[in-house]
């Protein structure tokens, strides 16, 4: 009976060790769950970014307005007959917090 008790205690100690410190332990499980949450957040951001890019591609394919806007903003191009004005100066007037 004494040997059986010793064997059972040793088995319990071995199982507890594996639970807390071994492969697939609770600590590793919590760490993996945290990594999954971070990856899901990253995936959600990338899905939103992809949707924006898809919409932009669709706009560029379907009409000239988006293409013209992009040419104006990124390349500084102007239409024939338009006058380009560049405002040079410091920061815009900001309301004071007083």
From Swiss-Prot:
Periplasmic topological segments: 22-98
Keywords: Cell cycle, Cell division, Cell inner membrane, Cell membrane, Coiled coil, Membrane, Transmembrane, Transmembrane helix
GO biological process: FtsZ-dependent cytokinesis
Signal peptide region: none
Ranges of the Cytoplasmic topological domain: 1-3
Compartments where located: Cell inner membrane
TM ranges: 4-21
Keyword Hydrolase belongs to the record: no
Membrane topology of the entry: Single-pass type II membrane protein
Keyword Coiled coil set for record: yes
Cellular component, GO annotation: cell division site; cell septum; plasma membrane
Coiled coil residues, start to end: 31-74
Family: Belongs to the FtsB family.
Binding partners and assembly: Part of a complex composed of FtsB, FtsL and FtsQ.
Record-linked PANTHER family: CELL DIVISION PROTEIN FTSB
Function of the molecule: Essential cell division protein. May link together the upstream cell division proteins, which are predominantly cytoplasmic, with the downstream cell division proteins, which are predominantly periplasmic.
Protein name: Cell division protein FtsB
Organism: Shewanella halifaxensis (strain HAW-EB4)
Name of the coding gene: ftsB
């Amino acid at each position: 009976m004494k040997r059986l008790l010793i064997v059972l205690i040793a088995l319990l100690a071995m199982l507890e060790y594996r639970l807390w410190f071994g492969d697939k332990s609770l600590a590793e499980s919590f760490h993996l769950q945290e990594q999954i949450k971070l990856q899901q957040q990253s995936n959600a951001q990338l899905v939103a970014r992809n949707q924006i890019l898809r919409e932009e591609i669709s706009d560029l394919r379907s009409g000239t307005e988006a293409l013209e806007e992009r040419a104006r903003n990124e390349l500084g191009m102007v239409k024939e007959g338009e006058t380009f004005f560049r405002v040079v100066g410091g920061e815009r007037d900001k309301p004071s917090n007083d």
